[in-house]
């Protein structure tokens, strides 16, 4: 006799509801998991534009104010019209003016490039134009139309640009909107070109126009205006508090998510020309230099080797990577003994970065280490801040490890 298999009893709707909940949770986790990657895609494409613009602008300043010795209070155009320059010097000054103008244009394209590539990362190449348009409107917003009761006339006014905040919001929204429309709007094959070259671009452009004018520009402009007001009111103290916060967030996880978030904030202020990126750039290199230095001085200071054998060559590697702008060389030290490494390099990064900012070091160009050092204002002070932070890091980690070793809480295999 054949044995009939019993089928499992299925409760109608139960499995479907469970699957729906599971899919909803997966989509939420997928959204928040993928979003940082999309943002970093935009930042990585924006940085070369900023560097190109920054380097060319730096050429103009070096030629005009270092080579030709123009007084700092005089602009390049004023120097051209002064009649004091002729021949080769006049040609150099014309080139400086061209470099200044062209570099400024490149800087203006940084935020649109960021928004375009964030949208492209989310919604594909169909979302690229919408992101670019949104980024451009975040820096060059549409004039506001107002009715003046006193004159009974319509007039326009210039809103506060939403800049990086607006570009971030519109690029994400536009990217997902284009992605959704591309999936939902199904047309016959012979209308595919119409969909991709006309319908989706027009719909996304209209959406960007309305969203930027009525929502994002007012919101982002309000935030930017508030930030500028607070920083202006706080003056030097506000800049120093910002430097301390950015340095701490940059150093704490050595290239991890907190570091990336700090980079996002620093880039937004730098591209808006509100605050320079000095503190972040210094805080990137201090931890690996300081921990590498600790492996060199530990025996000289204490008479003992306080690191495991494999960390000594890694210390030299970390120092080399630091000069390339890579902080991840310090990760082995943080993993091996977080209680000694993390407080040490955080204190060093905060003190070194804040000291450099306080003493007048300024870096507007969004790169770190040797790639940006030639473009730093007050480079001597900047390097002194790095040295101070690295020395503090090295001394702290050496004496913390010595204290833990004496208490029997640290085992070392290189004695």
Curated annotation (Swiss-Prot):
Residues 35-415 form the PTS EIIC type-2 domain. Residues 68-101, 148-157, 219-237, 298-318, 363-378 are periplasmic. It comes from the Bacteria. Residues 1-46, 123-126, 179-197, 259-276, 340-341, 400-415 are cytoplasmic. GO terms for molecular function: protein-N(PI)-phosphohistidine-sugar phosphotransferase activity; protein-phosphocysteine-sugar phosphotransferase activity. GO terms for cellular component: plasma membrane. InterPro entries: Bacterial_PTS_Sugar_Transport, PTS_EIIC, PTS_EIIC_2. PROSITE patterns: PTS_EIIC_TYPE_2. It is a multi-pass membrane protein. The chain crosses the membrane at residues 47-67, 102-122, 127-147, 158-178, 198-218, 238-258, 277-297, 319-339, 342-362, 379-399. Pfam families: PTS_EIIC. It is found in: Cell inner membrane. Keywords: Cell inner membrane, Cell membrane, Membrane, Phosphoprotein, Phosphotransferase system, Sugar transport, Transferase, Transmembrane, Transmembrane helix, Transport. Its main location: membrane. The EIIC domain forms the PTS system translocation channel and contains the specific substrate-binding site. The phosphoenolpyruvate-dependent sugar phosphotransferase system (PTS), a major carbohydrate active -transport system, catalyzes the phosphorylation of incoming sugar substrates concomitant with their translocation across the cell membrane. This is Fructose-like permease IIC component. It comes from Shigella flexneri.
């Amino acid at each position: 006799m054949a044995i009939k298999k019993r089928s499992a009893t299925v409760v109608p709707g139960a499995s479907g509801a469970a699957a729906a909940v599971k899919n909803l949770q997966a989509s939420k986790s997928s959204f928040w998991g993928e979003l940082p990657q999309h943002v970093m895609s935009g930042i990585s494409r924006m940085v070369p534009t900023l560097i190109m613009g920054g380097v060319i602008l730096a050429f103009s300043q070096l030629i005009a104010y270092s080579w030709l010795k123009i007084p700092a209070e005089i602009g390049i155009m004023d120097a051209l019209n002064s009649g004091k320059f002729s021949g080769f010097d006049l040609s150099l000054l014309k080139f400086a003016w061209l470099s200044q103008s062209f570099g400024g244009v490149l800087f203006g394209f940084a935020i649109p490039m960021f928004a375009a590539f964030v949208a492209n990362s989310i919604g594909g190449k169909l979302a690229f134009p919408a992101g670019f348009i949104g980024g451009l409107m975040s820096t060059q917003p549409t004039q506001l139309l107002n009715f003046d009761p006193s004159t009974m006339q319509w007039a326009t006014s210039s809103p506060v640009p939403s800049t990086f905040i607006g570009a971030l919001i519109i690029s994400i929204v536009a990217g997902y909107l284009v992605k959704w429309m591309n999936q939902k709007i199904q047309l016959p094959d012979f209308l595919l070109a119409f969909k991709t070259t006309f319908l989706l671009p027009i719909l996304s452009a209209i959406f960007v126009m309305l969203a930027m004018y009525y929502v994002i520009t007012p919101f982002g402009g309000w935030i930017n205006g508030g930030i500028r007001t607070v920083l202006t009111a706080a003056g030097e103290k506000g800049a120093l508090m910002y430097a301390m916060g950015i340095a701490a967030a940059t150093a704490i996880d050595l290239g991890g998510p907190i570091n990336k978030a700090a980079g996002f904030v620093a880039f937004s202020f730098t591209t808006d020309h509100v605050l320079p990126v000095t503190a972040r750039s210094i805080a990137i290199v201090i931890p690996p230099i300081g921990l590498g230095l600790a492996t060199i001085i530990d025996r000289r200071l204490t008479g003992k080797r306080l690191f495991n054998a494999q960390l000594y060559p890694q210390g030299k590697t970390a120092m080399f990577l630091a000069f390339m702008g890579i902080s991840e060389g310090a990760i082995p030290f943080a993993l091996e003994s977080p209680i000694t490494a993390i407080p040490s390099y955080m204190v060093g990064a905060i003190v070194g970065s804040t000291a450099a900012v306080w003493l007048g070091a300024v870096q507007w160009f969004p790169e770190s280490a040797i790639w940006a050092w030639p473009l730093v204002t007050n480079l001597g002070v900047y390097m002194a801040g790095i040295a101070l932070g690295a020395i503090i890091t090295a001394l702290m980690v050496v004496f913390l490890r010595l204290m833990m070793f004496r208490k029997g809480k640290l085992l070392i295999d290189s004695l």
